[in-house]
């Protein structure tokens, strides 16, 4: 309310007062005093904060400050931005987002409660409160690698953003090692196969990890293999030695072993040796001379259950076939 008087304090009605207001406030540019010399000045604004209102007549001026406050009834999520992404999915390292709450005209709203939700198993505080500038930091952790959708809500206003958690290579481990093909021929070409799977401590698949491989009993394998995006890698092992071989996959201090079996190659069965074990028996049709035959494949692996044909000349008698022992 402005009051206009003459130099001796007498009220002056019908006087035109010029009015100005800053900080985006709106006011009538001139107003006229009532008979009692006063005039009500109405000031509106869509901008929260202090506005200086100045009333002037002739060369006389007075100013007062008025305050406009943001409209909590129209509180909304004005923005939601990711400020830190690609944190390790260890349940401790956090991805960060910043929400900003304003009223319908963009004025920052402090002290507002924002509800927060996060998908894919991520953990976050269910509510956060805005600072004086209308912003609030949102911390999200997870033990699950992948994308988590974070949603901030106030009133009926919501915004969502995706954050990514990555598996923790520091805790890489052999989660499992399984035999996918066994009992291959010990010919140095046919392979037994195993599949290793590498994860972090929380079971998240780790791609691009180098796994060391060892195999005993003369088996040949690549010394290292690299995991695919799903954390798995195929391990191929070959051998020229029949029998059981232990295959061991290692990463960091984590190790797993499985046995595979190579079998002798019946396709290359051969008489490896034939030796006389008893000689000079009496020729009475009963006392026998004996021999021992050994059958192997091309790489010297013994072959059991193989039928060997036998011939003897000069009238000697023998079984026409014999079968090799284990």
Where are the regions a protein language model picked out?
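The feature marks long extracellular or luminal low-complexity segments
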Residues: 1-326
């Amino acid at each position: 309310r402005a009051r206009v008087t003459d130099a001796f304090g007498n009220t002056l009605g019908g006087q035109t007062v010029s009015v100005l207001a800053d900080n985006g406030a709106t006011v009538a540019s001139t107003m006229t005093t009532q008979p009692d010399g006063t005039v009500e000045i109405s000031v509106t604004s869509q901008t929260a904060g202090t506005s200086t209102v100045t009333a002037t007549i002739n060369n006389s001026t007075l100013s007062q400050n008025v305050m406009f406050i943001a409209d909590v009834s129209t509180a909304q999520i004005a923005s939601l931005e990711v400020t830190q992404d690609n944190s390790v999915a260890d349940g401790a390292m956090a991805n960060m987002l910043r929400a900003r709450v304003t009223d319908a005209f963009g004025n920052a709203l402090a002290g507002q409660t924002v509800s927060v939700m996060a998908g894919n198993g991520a953990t976050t505080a269910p509510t956060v409160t805005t600072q004086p500038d209308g912003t609030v930091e949102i911390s999200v952790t997870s033990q699950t690698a992948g994308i988590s959708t974070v949603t901030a809500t106030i009133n009926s206003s919501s915004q969502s953003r995706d954050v990514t958690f990555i598996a923790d290579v520091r805790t890489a481990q052999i989660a499992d090692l399984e035999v996918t093909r066994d009992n291959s021929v010990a010919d140095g070409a046919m392979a037994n196969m195993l599949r290793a799977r590498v994860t972090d401590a929380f079971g998240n698949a780790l791609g691009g990890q180098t796994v060391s491989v060892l195999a005993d009993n003369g088996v040949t394998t690549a010394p290292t293999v690299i995991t695919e995006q799903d954390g798995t890698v195929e391990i191929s092992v070959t051998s020229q030695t029949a029998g059981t071989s232990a295959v061991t996959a290692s990463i960091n201090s984590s190790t797993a072993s499985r046995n595979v079996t190579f079998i002798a190659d019946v396709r290359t069965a051969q008489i490896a040796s034939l030796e006389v074990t008893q000689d000079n028996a009496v020729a009475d049709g009963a006392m026998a001379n004996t021999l021992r035959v050994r059958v192997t494949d091309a790489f010297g692996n013994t072959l059991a259950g193989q039928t060997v044909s036998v011939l003897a000349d000069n009238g000697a008698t023998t079984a026409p076939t014999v079968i090799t022992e284990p």
